[in-house]
């Protein structure tokens, strides 16, 4: 990575609040337990992972003028991410995700308050237009509005845009703009939603990939669960990368780590197939850690993991 290169990440940032009950829950009563506050959000997580991988990562997001907002910016900055271009919205709540889990670890209910993502507007992004257009790569997540995503794709100039679909419900925001996206990282359900083609197994993947490339997408990195990852680009390169055997502790953040790995490899000029394998290593490290973002993530640790990993098929 050249010293002047940097990555711009545009997406969500929120505080995750999780309540863990010590015993079976008694409803309509106060239950003893443990409450954890952790920084989260797809864009923010990707930015932190990029910083851990040695990149200059700038997060463009929105927080409220409340305690959570200040805490979120401080913690994110302490993790190595530049947050000076984040928008602080007076009188608005910082995006938060509140979950309640019983003593077995099962989530019983959750409430999300993410309205502040609507503050990430085309006008806000345009204020940082020149900075965005000088990035080595732009990463966007589909938590932001369709208007904001459209601005990014219309104004990226020659900067490649990597998009995290986030969910089957949110990925439709970019369905008509695949020709403006460099790399898309969907899972099986997101790919089915976008293409309208059923993905029953490995035999359907080439057909789905062809649909994406016919609609102009440059690179597809398709997570197929236990089958591994299928990757293809518009020039014809394609293949399967086997899943890495992992002791799964926490599934939250694995996809964010994978996207960070893909973007980091692009900055470093790594070949496509090697990039996918490296990104899987990043995901494996996230899965094997109790935290959403594994503090031990580094290029050296990922390479070591990938070189010594046991494949599942």
Curated annotation (Swiss-Prot):
Family annotation (SUPFAM superfamilies): Ribokinase-like
Highest taxon listed in the record's lineage: Bacteria
EC number: 2.7.1.83
GO molecular function: ATP binding; pseudouridine kinase activity
Pfam families on file: PfkB
The reaction(s) this protein catalyses: pseudouridine + ATP = psi-UMP + ADP + H(+)
Keywords, ordered alphabetically: ATP-binding, Kinase, Nucleotide-binding, Transferase
Biological function: Catalyzes the phosphorylation of pseudouridine to pseudouridine 5'-phosphate (PsiMP).
The family this protein is said to belong to: Belongs to the carbohydrate kinase PfkB family.
Name by which UniProt lists this protein: Pseudouridine kinase
């Amino acid at each position: 990575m050249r010293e002047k290169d940097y990555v711009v990440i545009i997406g969500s940032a929120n505080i995750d609040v999780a309540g863990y009950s010590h015993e079976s829950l008694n409803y309509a009563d106060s239950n003893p337990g443990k409450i954890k506050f952790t920084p989260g959000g797809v864009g923010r997580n990707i930015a932190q992972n990029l910083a851990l991988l040695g990149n200059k990562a700038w997060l463009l997001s929105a927080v409220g003028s409340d305690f959570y907002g200040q805490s979120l910016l401080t913690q994110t900055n302490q993790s190595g991410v530049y947050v000076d271009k984040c928008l602080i919205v007076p009188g608005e709540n910082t995006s938060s995700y509140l979950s309640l889990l019983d003593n077995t670890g099962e989530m019983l209910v959750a409430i999300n308050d993410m309205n502040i993502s609507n503050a990430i507007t085309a006008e806000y992004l345009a204020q940082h237009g020149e900075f965005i257009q000088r990035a080595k790569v732009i990463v966007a997540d589909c938590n932001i509005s369709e208007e904001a995503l459209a601005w990014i794709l219309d104004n990226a100039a020659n900067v490649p845009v990597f998009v995290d679909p986030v969910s089957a419900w949110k990925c439709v925001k970019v369905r008509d703009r695949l020709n403006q996206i460099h790399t898309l990282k969907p899972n099986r359900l997101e790919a089915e939603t976008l293409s309208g083609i059923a993905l029953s197994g490995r035999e359907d993947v080439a057909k789905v990939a062809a649909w994406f490339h016919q609609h102009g997408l440059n690179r597809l990195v398709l997570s197929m669960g236990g089958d591994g990852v299928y990757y293809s680009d518009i020039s014809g390169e394609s293949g399967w990368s086997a899943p890495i055997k992992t002791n799964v502790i926490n599934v939250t953040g694995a996809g964010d780590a994978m996207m960070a790995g893909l973007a980091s490899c692009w900055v470093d000029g790594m070949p496509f197939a090697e990039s996918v394998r490296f990104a899987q290593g990043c995901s494996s490290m996230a899965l094997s850690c109790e935290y959403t973002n594994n503090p031990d993530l580094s290029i050296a640790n990922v390479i070591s993991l990938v070189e010594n990993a046991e494949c599942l098929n």
